[in-house]
């Protein structure tokens, strides 16, 4: 319709006129692009919050299915294993969000834990502020994983928001003390 086309045109003009910054936008990483309704709801909640702050904020989502995520959520995407693309996005973004779900755990896979910890560290080294958003933490069973997670989170994360008290206890038992830690709620609810 004419209204739809006018809206698209206005959005393009607004984005074009948006002030340019050296570091701008956000990179969001979670278990996205897998067809899981819970993870999709978390991503939708994060995107709504980011767009309420700035509707034209550049957003890049690391996802298993870049095309579907790009079309569904109208965001830039990078494949989870496309390291060059997501590291480039991190160098330009001001914020990295590791978000939603229980990503910091070693029960389902140690590779998953290493992946998320590596990305957190890479975002910090790239100059992003790092937030863990609406997370569940644990269980992290292996002692070497607990030490690694505590080391990375203490050194690389600026703020952690948790979705339940057990996650706070898990972080405390691991010795995570440096980032600001807030008990909030599941972002999908």
What would you call each of these model-derived segments?
Residues 1-16:
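A charged, aromatic-enriched C-terminal amphipathic alpha-helix characteristic of glycosyltransferases
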Residues 142-189:
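A nucleotide-sugar donor-handling region in carbohydrate enzymes
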Residues 18-141, 188-189:
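Aromatic- and Gly/Pro-rich donor/ligand-binding loops
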Residues 1, 35-36, 182:
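Residue-level recognition of hydrophobic positions within alpha-helical transmembrane segments
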Residues 3-6, 44, 165:
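Generic alpha-helical structural signal
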């Amino acid at each position: 319709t004419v209204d739809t086309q006018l809206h698209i045109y206005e959005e393009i003009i607004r984005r074009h006129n948006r002030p340019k910054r050296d570091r701008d936008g956000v990179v969001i990483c979670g278990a996205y692009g897998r067809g899981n309704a819970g993870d999709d709801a978390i991503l939708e909640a994060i995107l709504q919050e980011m767009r309420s702050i700035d509707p034209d904020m550049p957003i890049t989502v690391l996802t298993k299915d870049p095309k579907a995520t790009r079309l569904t959520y109208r965001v830039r995407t990078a494949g989870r294993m496309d390291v060059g693309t997501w590291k480039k996005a991190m160098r330009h973004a001001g914020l990295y969000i590791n978000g939603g779900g229980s990503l910091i755990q070693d029960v389902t896979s140690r590779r998953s834990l290493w992946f998320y910890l590596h990305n957190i560290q890479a975002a910090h080294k790239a100059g992003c502020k790092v937030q863990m958003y609406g997370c569940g933490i644990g269980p992290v069973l292996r002692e070497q994983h607990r030490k690694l997670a505590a080391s990375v989170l203490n050194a690389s994360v600026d703020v952690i928001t948790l979705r339940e008290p057990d996650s706070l206890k898990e972080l405390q038992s691991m010795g995570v003390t440096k980032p600001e830690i807030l008990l909030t709620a599941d972002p999908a609810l």
